[in-house]
Curated annotation (Swiss-Prot):
NCBIfam families: histidine_hisI. It catalyses: 1-(5-phospho-beta-D-ribosyl)-ATP + H2O = 1-(5-phospho-beta-D-ribosyl)-5'-AMP + diphosphate + H(+). Its main location: cytoplasm. Residues 83-103 have a biased composition (Basic and acidic residues). This is Phosphoribosyl-ATP pyrophosphatase. Belongs to the PRA-PH family. SUPFAM superfamilies: all-alpha NTP pyrophosphatases (SSF101386). The gene is hisE. CDD domains: NTP-PPase_HisIE_like. It comes from Listeria welshimeri serovar 6b (strain ATCC 35897 / DSM 20650 / CCUG 15529 / CIP 8149 / NCTC 11857 / SLCC 5334 / V8). HAMAP family: HisE. One of its GO terms (cellular component) is cytoplasm. Residues 79-103 are annotated as: Disordered. One of its GO terms (molecular function) is phosphoribosyl-ATP diphosphatase activity. Pfam families: PRA-PH.
Amino acid sequence: MLNDLYEEIKKRKEQPKEGSYTNYLFEKGLDKILKKVGEETTEVIIASKNNNQELVNEVADLTYHLLVLLAEKNVSLSSVQAELERREGKLSTTRDRKEIDEL
């Protein structure tokens, strides 16, 4: 499903469709796309404190906007998948991570 959505987003970038929200984002450029990613991230955080359906809706919105960002930056979804696979099964300890307050 994510692959299909990503391919459709790339198609819209290459073959714009009038009135398309995806094309609107591409036309406005990287700053607008980043603003939407930030807004949706905040909405995920807020929804996490509310109810699960709201959380699902906001995560779907964030996922879509992240895919638009990847397409804008010409980063393939398969490269993200490969990175996740590379990390699969690796153990990490709290010693390997920065304290959240330090981020």
